[in-house]
Amino acid sequence: MGNKLSSVWSKFFSKKEAKVLMLGLDAAGKTTILYQLKLGMNLETIPTMGFVYEKIEHKNFKLSVWDVAGQDALRPLWKHYYQNTKGIIFVVDSSDEKRMSLAKEELHKILGDDEVKDAALLLLANKMDLKVMTPKDVENKMEIDKFQNKKSKTFGVVGLTGEGLTEAMDWLADNM
């Protein structure tokens, strides 16, 4: 009896574990967002070389978040992180219209890979405080509608302050 009760208890009250990749072009704000999620504060960051790994608890999940560098020379390495990924957070600098088509191209490469076909996609339109593009503008530029079978949602966020991140992560946790 004790084992059954323990099993039921852990099923409903223990946290599920999930691997999440945080990807996007360099200078999109991935590491700033990661530390805002982890610590609830803005830390001064430097460009990521390789990856940053953090464990974050959100809702009923223990998330293993891999923030992978977005520089041109390092993007081909992204695919080596895909295995067992349950969620993808793709961060876009909404103030950088010049690189929006490049961001779209990289996102479509990711979404075209079978290893992440079942992963939920959280598209973060970062730097909303600069008021250049709306989250819907970013979503349209990323042509997310081409992936109709993909669980995805776009949120406008401000990585420096954390604005919008709780709602975005709630959606991700509910859809993984």
For every predicted segment, state its role.
Residues 1-176:
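TRAFAC-class small GTPase G-domain
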